[in-house]
Regions:
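A generic structural motif
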Residues: 1-5, 116-128, 154-158, 260-269, ...
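Polar helix-capping/helix-linker motif
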Residues: 148, 254-255, 325
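His/Asp/Glu-enriched, well-ordered alpha-helical/loop segment
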Residues: 195-198, 214-309, 315-316
Length: 347
């Protein structure tokens, strides 16, 4: 995690040359042995330590007098010039804030055409229209995802149930602590170059906001044309645990199923979502692309996500005679890891 650490922010504020920034990023990559660079709420977590409670894309931080836009631009260039396979992984400013789709678009523009990956984009695709000042902006966001070649994203789908949100965005987690369920939470930044916040949370279809978050995530999946540009995630565990992936896949592959769930919501969001108007159903091939080959490609894992000769023998075999999509994905016939059978008939 970079973009909130004092050393980097000091370099940027002093006007360090890009090559000096690149040297620092390269050092961090080698020292930590990580596979990529992520920025969480660029500049915002550091600003929070100086009692700023919000930081927009073109707003200067109190301590270093630099903007999130500048941080994203410089880090995106460093990652690109160093040849890191995975592009800069960005958790945008203003997570969860109504109207934040505008700052998400500005963050995308900040990369100036360089490769960038926007993570849990559902949480950054909110408008502020309507009598509740909360609306879907998935159409506006996916327009950018579809038209910008070097832009990819994962969704961070919300599904109903109890979970725990865990984030390096201590600014946002502190703002959310009043919603903790159960009412026990933690935020800290002691000896953290970024931040840390854990807030338990229960998503329910009795909440207008939670129900619309559910719809916004599905809209984002279904409006993104290329499955190589969007990846299946629940931002585990923040939107839902990854064990719910079979249920999510069924929502994407079965329009009747998702329409039925929408109709049975405890709150009526039908006038606030275009979900029913979207007729698309993901194919099995598109699911394979979105969950296997495309993630391997963007991470630079050339031996993964493929059935070609010399690829790793990581293979899942499903029983296509099982009619229920969720059941089929939940109980694979075989899971083979490095050529060894590790799961047979779902166990």
């Amino acid at each position: 995690l970079l973009g909130n650490d004092d050393f980097l922010l000091d370099l940027i504020s002093r006007g360090a040359h890009q090559s000096e920034i690149n040297d620092y990023v390269a050092f961090i990559l080698k020292a930590t042995q990580c596979i990529g660079i992520k920025v969480v709420n660029p500049g915002g977590i550091n600003a929070f330590k100086f009692n700023q409670r919000a930081l927009n894309v073109d707003e200067n931080s109190i301590r270093y007098k630099i903007t999130p836009r500048k941080i994203v631009r410089i880090l995106a260039r460093a990652v690109y010039e160093l040849g890191v396979p995975h592009p800069l992984h960005v958790h945008c400013s203003n997570l969860g804030v109504p109207g934040n789709f505008k700052s998400t678009i500005e963050t995308i523009k900040a990369a100036e055409g360089l490769p960038v990956h926007i993570t849990h984009i559902q949480f950054h695709s909110y408008g502020n229209n309507g009598d509740r000042n909360f609306s879907s902006a998935s159409a506006e966001i996916t327009e950018y995802v579809n038209k910008i070649p070097n832009l990819t994203c994962d969704v961070g789908q919300v599904l109903f149930g109890q979970t725990a949100t865990m984030s390096g965005d201590s600014m946002k987690q502190h703002a959310n602590h009043s919603h903790a369920h159960p009412d026990k939470w933690l935020c800290m930044d002691i000896e953290c170059e970024a931040g840390c916040g854990v807030v338990p949370f229960k998503y329910t279809d009795q909440s207008f906001v939670n129900a619309l978050q559910w719809a916004i995530g599905l809209e984002t999946f279904l409006l993104t044309e290329d499955p190589e540009k969007i990846f299946l995630t629940t931002d585990h565990p923040n939107g839902a645990p990854f064990t719910s992936y079979p249920h999510l896949i069924k929502l994407l592959m079965d329009k009747t199923f998702r329409d039925d769930l929408l109709d049975r919501m405890s709150v009526d969001i039908s006038e606030h979502t275009i979900l029913k108007e979207i007729r698309r159903e993901y194919t099995l091939s598109e699911i394979a692309t979105m969950t296997r080959s495309a993630p391997a490609k963007i991470l630079g894992l050339t031996n993964k996500g493929s059935l070609s000769i010399n690829s790793d023998a990581d293979i899942t075999i499903y029983d296509s005679t099982i009619k229920d999509i969720e059941e089929m994905f939940a109980k694979p016939t075989y899971v083979i890891k490095d050529g060894n059978v590790v799961v047979k008939n779902g166990v």
